[in-house]
Curated annotation (Swiss-Prot):
GO BP: any one term: translation
UniProt superkingdom: Bacteria
Protein name as annotated: Large ribosomal subunit protein uL13
Function: This protein is one of the early assembly proteins of the 50S ribosomal subunit, although it is not seen to bind rRNA by itself. It is important during the early stages of 50S assembly.
Family annotation (InterPro entries): Ribosomal_uL13, Ribosomal_uL13_bac-type, Ribosomal_uL13_sf
Subunit structure comment from the entry: Part of the 50S ribosomal subunit.
Listed CDD domains: Ribosomal_L13 (cd00392)
Family membership noted in the UniProt record: Belongs to the universal ribosomal protein uL13 family.
CC per GO annotation: cytosolic large ribosomal subunit
PANTHER family cross-referenced by the UniProt entry: LARGE RIBOSOMAL SUBUNIT PROTEIN UL13M (PTHR11545:SF2), RIBOSOMAL PROTEIN L13 (PTHR11545)
Molecular function GO labels: mRNA binding; structural constituent of ribosome
Keywords attached to this entry: Ribonucleoprotein, Ribosomal protein
């Protein structure tokens, strides 16, 4: 019996919608990253993007445990000398709610072109509405 290897044009991708209300950031991000990679499928192949599309709504209602709301730091750099900026979880969630989950999931995906393609299948929205109803996403309980 030969080892199965998925071909990119043979992969069937489904759409799922996840409600992030009152979910813990890391636990949600880990499951979303697993589904973006396609590890939940029997046809998973490491060098092929076999994952599904994930739409996450109510991202502004994500939570973290312990003191991480104030202690968790996010860094970015402008590219100029001395141009490093630091913010904490609470401030970033108030200003850009989607970015918190996107950064958490991005760190759990492979680096390189394959990981970037997987990250493009993640759609995050702060409110309860999303523009992907034409794809008829299935509700995914995490």
């Amino acid at each position: 019996m030969k080892t199965f290897s998925a071909k990119p044009h043979e992969v069937k991708r489904d759409w799922f919608v996840v409600d992030a209300s009152d979910k813990v950031l890391g636990r949600l991000a880990a499951e979303v990253a697993r589904r973006l990679r396609g590890k939940h499928k029997a046809i998973y192949t490491p060098h092929v993007d076999t994952g599904d599309f994930i739409v996450v709504v109510n991202v502004e209602k994500l939570r973290v445990t312990g003191n991480k709301a104030l202690d968790k730091k996010y860094y970015r750099h402008t590219g100029y000398p001395g141009g490093i900026y630091e913010t904490n979880f609470t401030k970033l969630q108030q200003r850009f709610p989607e970015r918190v989950l996107e950064k958490a999931v991005k760190g759990m995906l492979p680096k390189g072109p394959l990981g970037y393609a997987m990250l493009k299948k993640l759609k995050c929205y702060a409110g309860g509405e999303h523009p992907h109803s034409a794809q008829q996403p299935q509700v995914l309980e995490i």
